[in-house]
């Protein structure tokens, strides 16, 4: 159905008609000029992410439901990275004419899946038209007690550096998708050049080769915010001294922590958690797997520091790896290779010159 047939308000009503409030802090959600929230005993955390088609996602290989899920999860991840609990979400969309009502419903179904997983209320947003493509802007609102909030600037000399999950898989998943996309388009161009109509018809049923790489696809297409790690830390009585989520790459995030905390760091290549599929894919593509793990981005794992006294507790946690320690600023930022050589840790995350 064409969105113009039901209009903006009709679309909003259709998307939000079944929303049920999950949080006491949500006093009034969708349906008025503003949502009404109440946080009498907590600090309020607010984060926003903007995703643009052609810059942050490619609809050639991500479907709208997965896109909605990922768009929500990257915002929830920011709240977890502050040691908070996400409570509400607003969703704003700019849509070109090629998107139907059903397309938007599919996108929203992914957003709702993410929100249902972490008991988050969708309380508002906006829609508008776009001349080109799709733009998604999501704002997440969370809460935390003042004494529980973890900033980037709290790391101290001798603190341990930890990371959840594994690194580089999402980036290698992207490389896999790009490879298969290029294979498809090169075959299409070849068929067109030869005027081979039969080949073009067969390419309509093109099957990319993802065998043995399913985990990499999942990490790229279905990002997960690590709220489970926050729960484990709380249950273990561990309060990180500094924390970030790994969106631009481990190197970039760790250097942010060091800069804002006024410290140095020392991490060890052999301690970096890397999945087997990531290593195999890096070898296939003649890429350095350590570089992928350090700079790939979109892992949405948590990198955090804890006092050295929490070492025994950290060792007991599943899916958390100790990768190094914080040093005095004068010692710089060091990566120790598997053979003991020392290199300056550098960030290759997102920037405006990229």
Where are these regions (language model features)?
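Small-aliphatic-rich amphipathic alpha-helix that forms the alpha element of a beta-alpha
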Residues: 64-88, 109-117, 232, 251-257
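Short pre-catalytic strand/loop immediately N-terminal to key active-site residues, enriched for Gly-Thr
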Residues: 62-65, 216-222, 241-242, 290-292
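Glycine-/charge-enriched secondary-structure boundary and capping motifs
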Residues: 2-20, 98-121, 131-136, 141, ...
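Glycine-rich anion-binding loops of enzyme active sites
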Residues: 38-41, 87-180, 325
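Short, acidic (Asp/Glu-rich) active-site segment that either coordinates a divalent metal cofactor
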Residues: 45, 135, 151-231
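Glycine-rich anion/phosphate-binding loops
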Residues: 28, 60-74, 98-109, 147
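Extreme N-terminal cap/leader segments of soluble proteins
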Residues: 1-63, 82, 91
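Residue-level signal for inorganic ion chemistry
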Residues: 36, 75, 83, 122, ...
């Amino acid at each position: 159905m064409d969105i113009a047939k039901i209009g903006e308000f009709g679309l909003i009503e259709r998307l939000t008609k079944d929303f049920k409030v999950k949080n006491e802090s949500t006093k009034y959600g969708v349906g008025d000029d503003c949502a009404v929230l109440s946080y009498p005993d907590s600090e309020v955390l607010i984060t926003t992410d903007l995703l643009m088609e052609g810059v942050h996602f490619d609809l050639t290989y991500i479907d709208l439901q997965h896109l909605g899920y990922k768009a929500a999860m990257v915002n929830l991840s920011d709240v977890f990275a502050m040691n908070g609990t996400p409570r509400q979400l607003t969703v704003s969309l700019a849509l070109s004419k090629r998107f139907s009502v059903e397309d938007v419903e599919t996108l929203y179904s992914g957003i709702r899946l993410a929100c249902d997983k972490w008991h988050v209320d969708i309380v508002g947003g906006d829609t508008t038209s776009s001349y080109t493509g799709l733009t998604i802007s999501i704002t997440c609102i969370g809460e935390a007690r003042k004494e529980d909030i973890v900033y980037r600037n709290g790391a101290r000399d001798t603190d341990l550096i930890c990371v959840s999950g594994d690194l580089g898989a999402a980036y290698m998943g992207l490389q896999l998708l790009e490879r298969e996309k290029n294979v498809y388009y090169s075959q299409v161009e070849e068929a067109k050049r030869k005027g081979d109509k039969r080949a073009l018809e067969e390419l309509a049923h093109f099957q990319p080769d993802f065998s043995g790489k399913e985990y990499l696809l999942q990490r790229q297409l279905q990002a997960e915010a690590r709220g489970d790690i926050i729960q484990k830390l709380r249950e273990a009585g561990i309060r990180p001294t500094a924390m970030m989520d790994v969106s631009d790459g481990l190197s970039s995030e760790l250097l942010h922590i060091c800069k804002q905390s006024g410290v140095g760091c020392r991490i060890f290549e052999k301690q970096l958690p890397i999945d087997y599929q990531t290593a195999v894919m890096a070898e296939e593509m003649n890429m350095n797997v350590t570089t992928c793990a350090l700079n790939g981005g979109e892992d949405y794992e948590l990198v955090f520091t804890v006092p050295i006294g929490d070492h025994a507790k950290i060792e007991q946690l599943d899916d958390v790896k100790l990768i190094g320690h914080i040093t005095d600023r004068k010692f710089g930022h060091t990566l120790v290779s598997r053979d003991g050589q020392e290199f300056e840790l550098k960030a290759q995350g997102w920037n405006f010159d990229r």
